[in-house]
Amino acid sequence: MGANENVRRVRESRGVTKSFMARGLGLSLQGYSHIEEGNVRLDVERMKKIGDLLHVDSAIFLNDELTESAIKPA
């Protein structure tokens, strides 16, 4: 999976809405949706901000195994 898909998976596992993410990133809801759909490439700064909003290390978005560990219940 790509980083965009991993962002969606982590966001959903945390129960965070797209609207919350959009506001936190200073984007419209449609703009944020484009990120999760893979229509927008994620740069390092945006990944860091997304990680901050979801309270995770942004590196997990680049690695499927780390993403899995982040979405599994503790």
Language-model-derived ranges and their functions:
Residues D52, A59-A74:
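Short, charged recognition helix plus adjacent turn
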